[in-house]
């Protein structure tokens, strides 16, 4: 009887451990981004992307994102924010570039939030983007580091999709600029 009970408990523990690995990764801080088109709520993956999460929260806590626009906006790909005012003046980052965390096991799937960067993999600062589709080409691969996922939209994906459908054009050297700016009014921890 004791052996049966011990075996049952062991199997239950193994089963619980397996179930915990199949559950979505733990989410920590939540950020509410209020835009001129509606509200987007984002859960951040601090455990998997601690550097990107701390960086993003530092910008959020400083009020940096208020007044910035979404640009570029590319239907079927992504919407990006965190860098430009509506007159297309770049707001200079307040923190140094961060280490690329695209090797964290998270993929650029629809609704995920990732760090934008230049060709230099370790150049991400304030700009981020929301994937509109699964963008496997942005994940880490044999070609090198990808774009680090550090969060996911948990409410307001309909707003993200509406932003993706706005009419865009060119402003100076910039393409995919919304004709009617989509403004980030605020980004705050929930």
Regions inferred by a protein language model and the residue ranges of each:
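Positively charged n-region of N-terminal signal peptides that target proteins for export
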Residues: 1-4
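Bacterial N-terminal signal peptides
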Residues: 6-16
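Cyclophilin-like peptidyl-prolyl cis-trans isomerases
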Residues: 16-190
């Amino acid at each position: 009887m004791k052996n049966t009970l011990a075996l049952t408990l062991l199997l239950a523990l193994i089963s619980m451990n397996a179930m915990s690995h199949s559950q979505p990764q733990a989410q920590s801080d939540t950020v509410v981004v209020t835009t001129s088109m509606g509200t987007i709520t984002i859960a951040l993956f601090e455990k998997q992307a601690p550097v990107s999460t701390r960086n993003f929260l530092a910008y959020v806590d400083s009020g940096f994102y208020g007044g910035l626009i979404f640009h570029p906006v590319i239907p079927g790909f992504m919407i990006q924010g965190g860098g430009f005012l509506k007159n297309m003046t770049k707001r200079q980052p307040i923190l140094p570039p961060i280490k690329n965390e695209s090797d964290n096991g998270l993929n650029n799937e629809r609704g995920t939030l990732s760090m934008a960067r230049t060709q230099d993999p370790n150049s991400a600062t304030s700009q981020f983007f929301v994937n509109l589709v699964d963008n496997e080409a942005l994940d880490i691969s044999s070609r090198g580091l990808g774009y680090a996922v550090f969060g996911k939209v948990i409410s307001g994906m309909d707003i993200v999709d509406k932003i993706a459908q706005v009419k865009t054009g060119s402003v100076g050297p910039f393409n995919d600029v919304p004709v009617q700016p989509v403004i980030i009014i605020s980004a705050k921890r929930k």
